Structures are given as C-alpha cells and as structure tokens.
C-alpha cells in the first residue's frame, strides 16, 4: 500500500503528539525503574516446537505443504457502465494431509455492497477504506458455480451448492477432495460494477482523454488452507490486505478497441492489439536501457495509434507462479518502456502507463526509469525479479501493489513518485515472493518493504532521493506512545490512524536497528536474504521469520522481538554517575548507567576527558540481562568531564533528559 499517506501522518504525529519523554517518578519525586530483566530476557519466547512442517531453525520442514490455485480468467469491460463481467476456471490442488468437504473463496468486491460488514465499520470521514460514500450497486453478482469433470472424454459441468457470507463464499463439494494432491476444477460466472474509488486499491480515474480503469480484486479468489489455521476466512473489511495461494494465470481481457491494456504477466498477442509501428517500438524498448516511447502524448487523439476494423479487442496475458493478478485499461494511456537487466542475465521490461495530465519531466516521464532502478537494485540485493514485466500505472489509487503491476498516484512527482514507485515494486519481495498472511501480519510485508525501500532510495541515482536521517530520540517518543497498539496486531485490530506507524515505520525501524546497532550489516543482510530464499513462494509465519534471523545470525533476539514487535515497550537509558578507582582518575573511572524502561538495547557512550580527548564505547545488550543498573571500569588516565549516552541519536531512547553526565552538574 501507499506509504506517502503514512509519511504525512507521521509529520502530523510529530507536530501534535504530546511528548512522553519524561521519566516515571513516584509520589516522593524519586525516579521509578520499570525495567524487569526477567521479563525482557525470559527464554520462554516460542510457544511451540519445530515440526515436520516448520522447523525449529526457521525453514520449511521436510513435510511442508501448501495448496495451489491456477486460474483461467476471461473478462469483458464495459467502459460506459463500468461493469466487468467474466468467467473463471479454477484448478485447485489440495496438497494438504486433510480431505476437504468444502472450500472457501474470497469475494472482495462485496466490501462495496451497501450492507456489507466493512461498510458498517467505515467512519463517515477520514478513511481510505470503502468507496468514499459512492452510491452504486457494488459487489459481485455470482451467476453460476459449476464443478467441471471429465466422464468418458466428455466434459460435464455440474452445479454445486454454495453459500455467500459477506466477502466469502463457501462451496460444498459433492464428494470430499482427496488429500495429498486431489484436484478439482470450478467454473464461476460473475460480474460487478467497478467503484470509482475502491478502498485505495482499485478504481476509475477520469482524464480528459478517457477513464483509466485500475482493476483489482476482480475475480473470486481461493482462500488459503494452511497448516496454521486451516481455512483462512477472515472477512475483507478494508484495512487488512490479502493472503493468497500461488498458481499460474491465463488471462483474456476484452475492451473497446481504442483502449490499451496493461496487466500482470506477459502479453502473448501483441500483433492483435498494437499497430505495426508500436510493435517495432516494443522491440526497440526490449533492447534499450533508456526509456522508449511506445505511444506518445501526440498520438492519443490519432485513431491510427490503435488497430482499426474492430469495436473490441481481446488482450491475452500469461503469468507463472503468482499469488494474484491485476490490470488497467484506458484510451488515455501514454505508454513507454525500457528493459530491466537481472543478475542471472535474464531480461524483463519496465513499463509505464499514464495520462497526459501525469506527463512531465519531473513526473511520470521518469516512471520507467524509477521502475527499472528499483527492481534492478532489489534483484541484485535480495532475489531476482520473477515476472516478465513491471508496469507502473498512473491511477486513482494512491499506491497499491500486485504481481508485476502497481497502481501509483497519478499526481505524484519527483521524490514522491520515486517513493511510491519504489515502495509498491518493493512489494514484489513482500508479499508477492514471500507470501505471508497480510490480513493478520501487515508488518511482515509493509514493514519489511519499507526497510528495503530505505536501502534502494539511498542507492538510487547517487542518492538523489536519499532518505534524510531522522532523530531516533524524537521517533522513540512517538512510536512508543501508549496510543499505539503493538506491532503484532492486525490492521483490523488497530486504529486506522496508527497503521502507518505500526505496519510500516516501526517494524522497518526495527530491522534497521537490528542491522545497524545489534547484529551488523553483513550478518543481518545474510540472514534477511536467507529468509527470502527459504520462504520464496511459500507462507511464513512471524515465528519462521524470527527463527531464521536468529539461526542464521547466531543471536538470541527474543528480547528484541518481545519488546519491539510483541509489546510496545519504551527505551530509556541513563548515565547516572561517574566515580574513580580509589578516587584517582589515573587508575580508571567507574561509570554507572541505568535502564529505566522495559526495552533493553546495546549501549553507546561518548566519553570526553579534561584534555579534550573524545572516545566511543559500545556495550552489548547483555549488560541488561541480569541488571537494572550497571557500573563498569573505563580505563581513564585523566578526569572525565562528560559522558553522553547515544550521542548520535541512533537508538529510540524516549527520554533524552538523562542521557548525559557532566562534571560539576
């Protein structure tokens, strides 16, 4: 999802949240120490042992399984009524050890029914969820659900019983689907009216040359059946995103002939939908590291820029091993593209589709450059981009990700456009490759993605949009405010205004702290990359992530997971005293530090002596493993004039007032 709204929110929080930096005092005015090292470092962190499905070391176990859903989708867009109608054929494979007497499907469009559960909980103003009050006949019309079977070489379609409950559909099977590879085929006919604004994930943008349809959650999708919860059937109410099975997609999209369609996957019939000149431009773009214009702004009003002779054209796309698909269609599209160079030597395409209103040298004319750079960086750093194309669409949606295609705000420019483009394509790795449960654990895709965005932004174009360094002490006061729920909350279970901090920034900040202050970049990057490789195209849980980082890095981090992710613990480190061995500075200094709040962290001290010499000292987090207060000997040779804790403000210390000791004060 779009992080730009979150950044605006964070600025508002910084401006308006009441500071909480003051330390806790009792009725007599004495400082209260809230730290409990037994709570922080308790060895009882994991609630279950490893098993054949998920190992204790964080790997998929030898008997790990997941089900599969392959889709053949054929839809038609009516750009006058905004109706999308279609047929899907699902091939569902049950690799679980359980027989399944019924299956569950997701009907996300039903969020936009007037009587939906999601609509009932959307506030009247200030929410990005729902359809922003649009009055229309939203939701799916399910025309038929049939089971396809083959009998004596003849295809038989049999109607099956089904029940629709809000954004879910339960289909009752005439006989149980066998475990360990049992397979069925379903055929569903359906239609829906696209909302103008679809919960910031899809919708319709009006431009002077026509509507831009950004189409997502556009077909009934299989729910995930896994070894953790069985059927994952939490309803779609808006705040939480998705949890989906992997499979192959065969997509046919029929639209008015003056439209251009971009989609997840690879276009397989360019000769039917592009002019000969445009086909040649595509070939040139596939060999170019610079952006090549496929359809220019000046051609938008030229009927020769579209194939003639038909009222409608059908666009065919294919996509392998993906968890979803989305597409966009418009007569208003300017199209440009360039090749992407991947570490293995393979090539992919960076593509942009936008209206003339979004065009400009500081705007969407750089979109393909941004798309190419973001995906090439992450491919080199983590795991190779897996899709034949990466398409950026100027959309009514502020920012939303799908496999090989993203929707970004049509008015974004310069750093804002880089930021949203990099963020949405960063989702290729989380959750498109690493298929975590977004509905329960948004921080495992938004937060992880926000973290890799910070590295990509630092790298891009010599630091053109390098993130500014933020004062972690100020952030520490904000993100541990008692108004925030723990990170380990689902978006459905936190205030909407808190999602930006809890799903995006705080979990990303946690990874940065681990990388820069706890583990070190080399060990952390190796562990993080291992997590991606282990769980590529699989379904990890938080425990799988925690265990992988610990096992690969070789560190027990339960104190960190417990304080930063499971709870909302504050950090407050203090320098409380400086004395000398036998009252002689030449024999060494006795420096006392204290941890006053529940979160432990390593200690960084800057020590300045009388001659002006300044030195740095770092103490491991283990000093707090059995101590609230710690005194250590510093090898001084002269009098110390000051000791400062965390001088560079790289730790989220919520109270800076006690971070320094100064001689004579």
Q: Model-found features: residue ranges?
A:
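Early extracytoplasmic/domain-onset interaction patches
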Residues: 25-106
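Glycine/proline-rich low-complexity spacer/linker segments in large multi-domain proteins
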Residues: 115-132, 191-249, 270, 649-665
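A surface-exposed beta-strand-loop module
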Residues: 24-34, 74, 83, 93, ...
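Beta-strand-rich binding/interaction modules
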Residues: 262-263, 573-574, 580-646
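Solvent-exposed beta-hairpin/edge-strand motifs
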Residues: 100, 104-153, 254-259, 608-618, ...
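Hydrophobic helix-coil surface modules that form long, contiguous segments used
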Residues: 220-229, 237-422, 451
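Short, hydrophobic/aromatic-enriched beta-strand segments in well-ordered soluble domains
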Residues: 88-90, 94, 107-109, 182-196, ...
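Hydrophobic alpha-helical and helix-loop surface patches within well-folded domains
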Residues: 21-22, 31-56, 68-69, 317, ...
């Amino acid at each position: 999802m779009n992080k730009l709204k979150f950044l605006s929110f964070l600025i508002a929080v910084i401006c308006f949240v009441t500071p909480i930096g003051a330390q806790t005092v009792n009725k007599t005015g004495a400082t209260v120490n809230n730290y409990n090292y037994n709570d922080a470092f308790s060895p009882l962190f994991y609630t279950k042992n490893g098993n054949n499905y998920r190992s204790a070391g964080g790997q998929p176990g030898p008997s790990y399984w997941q089900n599969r859903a392959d889709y053949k989708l054929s839809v038609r867009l009516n750009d006058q009524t905004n109706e999308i109608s279609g047929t899907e054929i699902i091939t569902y494979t049950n690799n679980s050890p359980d027989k399944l007497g019924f299956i569950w499907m997701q009907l996300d469009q039903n969020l936009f029914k007037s009587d939906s559960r999601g609509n009932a909980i959307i506030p009247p103003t200030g929410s990005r969820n729902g359809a922003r009050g649009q009055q229309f006949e939203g939701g799916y019309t399910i025309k038929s659900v049939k089971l396809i079977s083959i009998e004596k070489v003849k295809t038989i379609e049999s109607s099956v019983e089904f029940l629709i409950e809000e954004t879910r559909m339960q289909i009752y099977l005439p006989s149980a689907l066998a475990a360990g590879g049992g397979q069925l085929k379903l055929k569903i006919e359906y239609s829906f009216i696209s909302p103008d604004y679809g919960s910031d994930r899809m919708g319709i943008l009006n431009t002077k040359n026509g509507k831009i349809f950004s189409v997502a959650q556009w077909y009934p999708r299989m729910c995930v059946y896994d070894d953790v919860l069985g059927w994952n059937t939490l309803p779609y109410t808006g705040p939480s995103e998705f949890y989906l099975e992997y499979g192959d997609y065969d997509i046919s999209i029929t639209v008015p002939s003056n439209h251009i369609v971009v989609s997840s996957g690879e276009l397989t019939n360019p000769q039917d939908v592009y002019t000969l000149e445009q086909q040649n431009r595509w070939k040139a773009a596939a060999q170019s590291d610079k952006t090549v214009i496929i359809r220019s702004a000046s051609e938008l009003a030229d009927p020769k820029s579209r194939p003639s002779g038909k009222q409608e054209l059908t666009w065919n796309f294919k996509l392998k091993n993906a968890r979803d698909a989305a597409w966009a269609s418009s007569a208003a599209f300017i199209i440009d593209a360039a090749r992407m160079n991947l570490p293995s030597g393979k090539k992919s395409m960076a593509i942009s589709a936008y209206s003339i209103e979004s065009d400009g040298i500081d705007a969407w004319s750089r979109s393909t450059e941004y798309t190419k750079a973001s995906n090439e960086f992450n491919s080199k750093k983590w795991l190779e981009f897996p899709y034949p194309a990466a398409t950026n669409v100027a959309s009514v949606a502020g920012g939303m990700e799908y496999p090989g295609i993203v929707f970004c705000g049509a008015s974004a420019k310069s750093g804002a456009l880089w930021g949203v483009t990099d963020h949405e394509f960063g989702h290729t790795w989380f959750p498109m490759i690493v298929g975590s449960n977004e509905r329960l654990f948004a921080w495992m895709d938004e937060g992880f993605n926000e973290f890799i965005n910070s590295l990509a932004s630092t790298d891009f174009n010599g630091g053109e949009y390098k993130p500014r360094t933020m004062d972690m002490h100020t952030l520490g006061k904000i993100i541990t405010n008692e108004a925030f729920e723990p990170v380990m909350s689902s978006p459905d279970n936190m205030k909407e205004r808190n999602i930006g901090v809890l799903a995006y920034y705080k979990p990303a900040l946690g990874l940065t702290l681990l990388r820069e202050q706890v583990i070190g970049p080399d060990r952390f990057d190796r562990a993080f990359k291992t997590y991606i490789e282990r769980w590529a195209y699989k379904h990890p849980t938080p425990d799988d992530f925690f265990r992988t980082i610990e096992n690969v890095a070789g560190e027990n981090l339960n104190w960190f997971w417990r304080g930063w992710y499971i709870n909302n613990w504050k950090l407050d480190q203090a320098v409380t005293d400086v004395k000398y061995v036998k009252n002689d500075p030449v024999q060494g200094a006795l420096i006392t530090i204290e941890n006053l709040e529940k979160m432990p962290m390593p200690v960084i001290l800057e020590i300045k002596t009388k001659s002006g010499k300044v030195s740095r000292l770092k103490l491991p987090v283990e000093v707090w493993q059995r101590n609230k207060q710690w005194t250590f000997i510093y090898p001084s040779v002269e009098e110390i004039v000051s000791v400062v804790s965390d001088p560079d403000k790289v730790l989220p210390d919520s109270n800076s007032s006690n971070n320094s000791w100064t001689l004579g004060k």
